[in-house]
Amino acid sequence: VLSPQLLQTIHAPLVKTPGERARLRKFLERVNEAHYGLGWRQYDYAGYKVIGHRGGVNGYRSLILFDPRLKSGVVALWNSNTSQPGGLEFEVMDMLYGLPFRDWMELDSKPARTPEPADQEEREHAA
C-alpha cells in the first residue's frame, strides 16, 4: 500500500504535453489540458482532474483512468492490436460526472469488423 503522500508525488503533473492533447483530438471538447509525471498522465477532463495510463505490446492493450477525488475510474484489458475500445474510459468518466452521453468509442458509427482467425488452421477452416 502506497502512502497518500507518495501517491500525490507520483500523480503530480510535471510536464505539459500538448502533443497528448492533440493525440486525443476527438475528445477535445472535454480534454482541456494534458500533463505527464512519473509514469502517469494527468488530464483536465471537463473541469475534473483525472489520472491515467495506457499502453500495449503485440496482441495486448490496457488502459486505466480514474478520479482520485471520487476514488472511482475504469480499467480495461484486451487482447488485440487495435486501440478499440479506445474511448471507453471517457464514456465511463462521463457517467461518473453525469455528463451527456457521447459515443466516444464510435461503436454506432463504425462498420463491424470481421475478426482475423487466430492461426492457419482457423483461416483454412474459415475459407
Report each predicted region and the residues it spans.
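Catalytic loop of the DD-peptidase/beta-lactamase superfamily, centered on the K-T-G motif
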Residues: 1-127
